[in-house]
Amino acid sequence: MMGAIASGMRLCRTWLIRTGLVLLLAGLVETLGAGPAAAHAVGNGVTASNYRTNVLGISPTVPGLEVSAIDIGNQLKLVNHTGQEVTVLGYELEPYLRIGPNGVEENERSPATFSNRSSMAPQQVPRGFDAKATPDWRRISTGTVAIWHDHRAHWSGRGEPAVVRQSPGQSHVVQPNWQVPMKIGDRTVIVSGNIVWVPGPSPWPWVAVAVLLIGAVLLASGSSRQAQVLAVVAGLAVVTDAVHTVGAWLGSPAPILTQLYSNASSFAGWVIAGVAIQRLLKGRVESARPYLLLAAIFLALAGAAPDVPSLARSQVPSGLDPTLTRLAIAATLGLGIGLAIAALLGRQLRIPALAGTPGSATARPRGTPAVARDGRRSTPSGSAQRLPKRNGGPSRNKKRR
């Protein structure tokens, strides 16, 4: 009975490992084939970019009115401390947003309400949205801060501008003067800015970091202390993924629930890695392998791999330093992929030169007696241990006189 249960558990582990291998390969293929539009990002789907949106000013100046670009230019943020009602005009100069003492309201009949739901400009606005219709206001917030995506202040072209294609390694102002008109009472206020192409860094140093970490994990996993090594690697992968996640949270204005949902894969990876570490610390390497594989898939493929474009883009959606963010992404990829391979190969990684390090059982030279726990030496097989003669004692082989 116990043998059948053990056999079933082995089959279950084998199935989990094979399934994990399929998921790992599929995730790598999808990640390598995904373009920027297909890549995942924390919060509201913002991905790394080489386009920087700048807000240059408000004309005329209005005390208490602040407008800034956030989410690496994907959204505009308006803070109204004027005590008056500020109306943001849409693409056809219709009332779109209204920010005042009573909160933030959105005109549900404005075409901008539909168009701004996506960062890609829609080909056609459906019926029901009419710039000439009487505004139908719906309150969306009780504060005096409005955040919205505005196509006028965001590069939404399907390709790079001609000037960028000619010299992509240099900075270029690709949109010199975007404008978003607003109304404050009877006054018209213009918020203006520009969009600049900023070339990104070379991704190869970060690729090298990931590859070196993969090699280091596999090499260290071949030692006699495989359980301890895998536990440390899993813990480091959780730490680097946590740094990446915290940076993305700090750089996104998305609501808490949205961010929790977007990072569910990372949270799952942390929990599963914790289970694997607990088993490894008890020396249960074989039972920890499926958990290591699943944790690596969640952390490396679902967490870090979709943000690989950040390695080669200048504008990174993170509240942390871009270099630290890129390092966290590359490290999570390297540690996670190395951990997945180590979990898949298991005993096949045991390198004799490393597994036989001094202090291990396999390092004992042949013929050397091993020391048991009680301090006594065991006799090597094939040899007889001779007891030393006592000084002055009679010899058994000596004939009696």
Regions found by a protein language model. Give the residues of each.
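Hydrophobic secretory-pathway targeting helix
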Residues: 1-42, 399-400
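Alpha-helical transmembrane segments
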Residues: 12-23, 206-211, 226-236, 264-268, ...
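Juxtamembrane/start-of-transmembrane alpha-helix segments at the extracytoplasmic/lumenal side
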Residues: 196-209, 323-328
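Short hydrophobic alpha-helical membrane-anchoring segments
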Residues: 23-35, 245, 279, 307, ...
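Core alpha-helical transmembrane segments of integral membrane proteins
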Residues: 201-258
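Generic detector of multi-pass transmembrane helix bundles and their immediately adjacent loops
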Residues: 247-401
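Soluble extramembrane regions of membrane proteins in the secretory/endomembrane system
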Residues: 35-199
